[in-house]
Structures are given as structure tokens and as C-alpha cells.
Amino acid sequence: MNIYDNILKTIQQKGAAYLILLDPDKLVGDNINKFIRVCEDSGVDGFLIGGSLMLDGNFEPFVKKVKGITKLPVIIFPGSINQITSFADAILFISVVSGRNPEHLIGKHVISAPIIKQANLEAIPTAYVLIESGTSTTAQYMSGSLPIPRNKPEIAAATALAAEYLGMKLIYLEAGSGAKETVPNEMVKLVSEYCNVPIIVGGGIKSPNEARQKVINGANIIVTGNFFENENNWDLIKQFADSVHVNIPIKV
């Protein structure tokens, strides 16, 4: 079973999937092993690895180390064409459809496609939709694109639908790392009503209840990352997973 089909199966069985984003610039040393073990024990469904910036060139060794620790899916969430390695299971082949920067719509893809093929990576076509979040985010700056206004759910829905018609297999609604505000629930709901492919929601989700509300409103995959850079929050990972897995009764 490929990774995309595995994601679909998880969504069907659990109601939604919960992925945690690992940033090689932030998670270092022995904390990698410890954090991944906590995630596995807490019911996390897989990992995204990537970041808009890579300050130390440690991407491939980091992915290799993570794969050596866990049997959960490890998916590249690329911030640049340098973040490609055969040690991962798959890569989100991202097009920033909320913007009009040709480099992030098709330019970088032409360069990276042969590299991905050579690495024998499963590429998952993903529409990346940046949503206004109350602050300027690294993703916005690095992609050179404006986010969709958070009070314009109809624009997000039309954008997502167009991406689906173009053949995208995932829609990623992104508020941005460390966002002040999450993607609005009404926007998630409208996009889910328009689209038939899985919807990922990430950015600024800081509580299990927020994660649950995204799923209730139609999100199929929840991504958190920045929130768990603080080890004091690791105890909440299981609560996040339980909140996302709406088809599984919570054990008391």
C-alpha cells in the first residue's frame, strides 16, 4: 500500500488523521528519539519533515535518523528543492495555489521532479493554500505570495476546487507556523463542502479542542508542529490524537 492510500485508510478508519511536523532546525539531539517515542505511544499517524528555512544543512541525516526510529509514515513537507531524500516514504509535491508566483506554481517543480523520480519517492500532488492568520508567516515570505483573507472563505473554496480539478490529491489549508489564528472553521467547512479530496489543516492549532473543531467542520488531516517544540506540551500529544480520531471512542 502506498502512502497516499495509507492516509485514505487512516481517515476512513479513524475519522481523520493526525500528523506532526518535525523541523530539523528545531528538534535536535536525544530529543528526537524521545519525542518520536512519545508520538508513537500517543497515537500519532505519521510525520511530516521540513521547514521553510534550513540553517544547518542537516535535512537528509535528520530524515534518515527519523526513519531509523519509527515505522510510521515519514513524508517530506519541502520548503525548498534541497529538501529531497530517498530516505523518506513520500513527498508532498506542493503547488502554492493561493499565490501567483510562477516559481511556486510550476517553476520549482520542473527542477525537482527528476530528482524525486531518481529518489524513487512517492509524490503526492498537494495544493498549498495560505490563509491570513493575523501575522506575516515564514511560508508567506519565502513563497513571495499573499495569503487568502480569512474573511473570504468563498475564495479559499474556489481555489481548492480549481486545484482538485487540476488533479491535486490533497488540499492543505495553512495558517503558517506559529500563526496567531488558525484557519477559520467556517472556511474549513466550506472548502470541505466543495471538495472531494482530503483536506489538511495546519498552523496555529494550540489545543485538542481546536483540532477537534477543524475535524468536525470537515478537516481530514490535522497537522501540528510549532506547539510541540516546547517539551512541556508533549503531555498533550495523546489528547490531540484522541481529539482528531473522532471515530475512536476515547478511553477514560
Predicted regions and their residues:
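Active-site mouth loops of central-metabolism enzymes
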Residues: A16-I32, P78-S80, L130-A157, V201, ...
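Conserved anion-binding
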Residues: Q83-E164
